[in-house]
From Swiss-Prot:
Changing T57A: Significantly increases mutation frequency. Keywords: Exonuclease, Hydrolase, Metal-binding, Nuclease. The keyword Hydrolase applies. Its EC number is 3.1.11.-. It comes from Bacillus anthracis. Binds 2 metal ions per subunit. The endogenous metal is unknown. Changing N15A: Moderately increases mutation frequency. The gene is yycJ. Belongs to the metallo-beta-lactamase superfamily. This is Exodeoxyribonuclease YycJ. A divalent metal cation 1 binds at H58, H60. 5'->3' double-stranded DNA exonuclease. May play a role in mutation mismatch repair (MMR). Required for accurate coordination of cell division with DNA replication. May play a role in cell wall metabolism.
Length: 264
């Protein structure tokens, strides 16, 4: 079994990604309660006791809600950059010092046979960052919670065999929706979230012949729909000359249901 993953949950109510190999299993974020997380692991037919560490992207509650509980219950080391630690420590409760580790932006760390590269994104958090996972010339890239995708970010994630990529909102749905203008402005800003079309334009710059799977992630429950996101992204990519459904597959994610285990 090579590098594989499951998007356990994705959306504004909670985010978690499982990444593993035969040798090592990791969790990125813990945005649901401990009980909900355990239920998702069972649903995905994964064993939470196999997880050997949690990587944190940033301190927003939909990414750390269950972090303290899981770290304490399963004696898991937690990795985050210094600014994120400072921002979230009062939110997650006490975690023993020997379980707290610094993973700085731009660093590369090795966990068993998985090499993990972190990179900064543009979001209204202390120092948000996401990850690219490498194993035996296979690569998985995770990028959500960013207002735009810069050339620097693209440089890290380009050529991944699989992407978990933010496709947060449809701009028209957001503009016409019930959110107050202050929240709309925040989502549309450079430190907010990427819309369907902008996500697709960024994808067009990082997809290569090696890319086989794209998972559309962090969809807004109020300002997007799975079918709309998939259609919008597919349309832009097809206009750019990509063979959606032939060269690679586009997949949905869900806030309450894990995706099937996908090998990279």
């Amino acid at each position: 079994m090579g590098l594989h993953f499951s998007v356990l949950a994705s959306g504004s109510t909670g985010n978690m990604l499982y990444v593993g190999t035969d040798e090592k299993k990791l969790l990125v974020d813990a945005g649901l309660s401990g009980k909900a997380t355990e239920a998702l692991f069972k649903q995905a037919e994964l064993n939470i006791n196999d997880v050997s560490g949690i990587l944190v992207t940033h301190e927003h509650s939909d990414h750390i809600k269950g972090l303290g509980v899981l770290a304490r219950k399963y004696d898991l080391p937690v990795y985050a950059n210094e600014k994120t630690w400072n921002a979230m420590e009062h939110l997650i409760g006490n975690i023993p010092t020997d379980q707290k580790f610094i993973f700085s932006v731009g660093d590369v760390k090795t966990f068993g046979d998985i090499e993990v590269e972190s990179f900064g994104v543009s979001h209204d958090a202390a120092e948000p960052m996401f990850y690219a996972f490498h194993n035996n010339n296979r690569k998985l890239a995770l990028i959500t919670d960013t207002g735009y995708v810069s050339d620097r970010m693209k440089g890290v994630i380009k050529g991944a065999n699989a992407f978990v990529f933010e496709s947060n909102h449809d701009v028209e749905m957001l503009r016409m929706g019930r959110y107050p203008w202050s929240i709309k402005r925040r989502i549309l800003s450079d430190v907010g979230h990427v819309c369907n079309e902008d996500a697709a334009l960024a994808m067009a710059d990082v997809i290569t012949d090696e890319t086989k799977h794209i998972y559309l992630a962090h969809l807004s429950l109020d300002n997007n729909m799975k079918e709309l996101a998939r259609m919008s992204v597919s349309q832009v990519l097809e206009e750019k000359g990509f063979g959606v459904g032939e060269a690679f597959e586009i997949h949905d994610t869900d806030p309450k249901m894990p995706t099937k285990i996908q090998y990279v």
